[in-house]
Amino acid sequence: KNMTTGEIELVAEEIVILSKAATPVFPLDDYQDVNEDVRLKNRVLDLRRPEMNQRIVTRSKISSTIRNYLDDNDFHEIETPILTKATPEGARDFILPSRVQSGKFFALPQSPQLFKQLLMMGGLDKYYQIARCFRDEDLRADRQPEFTQIDIEASFIDQEYIMEIGENMIKELVHMFCGDSLDSFPVLNWHDSMRDYGCDKPDLRIPLKLVEISELVKDEEFKVFAEPAKDNNSRVVALKIPRGNSLSRGQIDEYTKFVSKLGAKGLAYIKVNNTDDIENGLQSPILKFLNKETINSLVAELDLNNDDLLFFGAGKASVV
């Protein structure tokens, strides 16, 4: 029933064994989960599974699409040497001894950095390579000792050009292999990213932003907020967590310890139970330090809803 021909029944009249074979360690269909360690130890069998086979075919097509796209944009694919000399980079080199020159060694490239600079100096203004790279370092979630990277280099261009090349390449790949058409990518400069998200590479799938509230609290008697709000080198921000009211006091204390290790002085909060009753519908140790006008302004400015949680940060702008 799992075959394209449907569920069929055969009646055998004669069976001839042409060769004996051991029973496969696991079935080759995609209908059963198999432990990854078992799959890797029996890689030949694993690659015969339709899912794995299709992934390899798809990867091949992706590489071909990238090459066609860059070729159409007048980039030249140029291979660079694998056996090279050690250069200062971010990890240790893999070393390969030379058979011809005793006591001498080759280093496997961590990236084609040196060679692409030579190509630019040699007059090849637009270069790319789907390059194998080698880094002798501990495994990480996004890094293996041996990996492939798309290396692109161009001379006499501006930032917008290389961003456009990369964006359009991703759009073409997504359209061809996922069937989706992507909108233009959002662009953030470093200062806006640090101001709104607190890091230089935010995950924009998470719709949480730091909101500046210095103007709202600068006249408060609560010095924890008022003093940094009046300091040009400091700031006061709020972070709204939709439906975050379920966080326990213990969990909030753990977050407070975490931000304290990063240099923050603390982590004030307000739990929103009922926005229709501001006087009794909010829960926080700091409410007694804030006047009603400020609290009402916070509710309106941050568009607070029932069961939301509001965190506050106050201090030097380099920390908050």
PLM regions: where:
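Class II aminoacyl-tRNA synthetase catalytic cores and aaRS-like
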Residues: 1-320
